[in-house]
Design a protein with these regions (language model features):
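Membrane-helix boundary/interfacial segments in multi-pass membrane proteins
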Residues: 47, 52, 105, 110, ...
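Transmembrane alpha-helices of multi-pass inner-membrane enzymes
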Residues: 1, 129, 137, 145-201
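Polytopic membrane enzymes that build or remodel cell-surface glycoconjugates and lipids
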Residues: 5-12, 30, 39, 120, ...
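Juxtamembrane loop-helix boundary motifs flanking transmembrane segments in multi-pass membrane proteins
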Residues: 55, 59, 99-107, 159-162
């Protein structure tokens, strides 16, 4: 028979998968199939155009266009750290002003920002590191809940802090006042997992 931990984990996986599938289907219907109007006020969030997200749609589109015109070396390793503003002002300054009335020196999407500045190799490595860290913390939380470990609240807090940061990074940029807290909570979560693993081995 399946253990409680396994059943709990499978239930969460199914729930998360169904949630992502529902959002994916809504986006397909609203954008590719052109049925955005049927969602009423929700179309503001579902339909992607240059005006969505306070003009984030514009800079996201231009970011992907800029990346598509990169030479091979830049497509692999990016244009250089913190050079997004140079890219946009050099190639899309007039278009930015005409379309949005402002200048974008960031992509307002941390993953797009990394894609253009440090390249897909570094971006993939970063995302794998975050996802693996969350996976290790999630496994610990499930085991700790069953064993009623006193460290559960700390582990849950660290896990969801990292997950929330990962989701908000789709519409924001990494800031010096915020990003250090990601690494602090991530380190605390991993340290908790390591401590639990060491005690278990002993």
């Amino acid at each position: 028979s399946l253990s409680t931990e396994t059943l709990f984990l499978k239930a969460w996986k199914i729930l998360v998968a169904l949630g992502f599938l529902a959002v994916f289907l809504l986006l397909i219907d609203a954008n590719i199939l052109g049925h955005g109007a049927r969602y009423g006020s929700l179309s503001t969030y579902l339909v992607f155009n240059d005006q969505c997200g306070t003009s984030r749609g514009f800079i996201w589109r231009r970011s992907l266009e800029l990346f598509s015109h990169f030479p091979l070396s830049h497509k692999l390793f990016g244009f250089g750290p913190d050079t997004f503003g140079i890219l946009t002002t050099r190639s899309a300054f007039k278009e930015m002003i005409a379309a949005t009335g402002q200048i974008f020196d960031t992509a307002h999407n941390e993953y797009l920002q990394y894609l253009l500045t440090i390249g897909p190799i570094a971006l993939i490595a970063y995302m794998i590191f975050l996802s693996n860290s969350c996976q290790h913390m999630a496994r610990y939380v499930l085991k700790a809940l069953i064993t009623e470990s006193t460290a559960v609240p700390y582990a849950i807090g660290c896990l969801f802090a990292v997950i929330c940061y990962g989701f908000q990074a789709f519409v924001n940029l990494n800031l010096p006042i915020i990003t250090p807290f990601l690494w602090i909570t991530l380190s605390m979560g991993i340290a908790t997992v390591k401590k639990y693993t060491v005690h278990k081995v002993k």
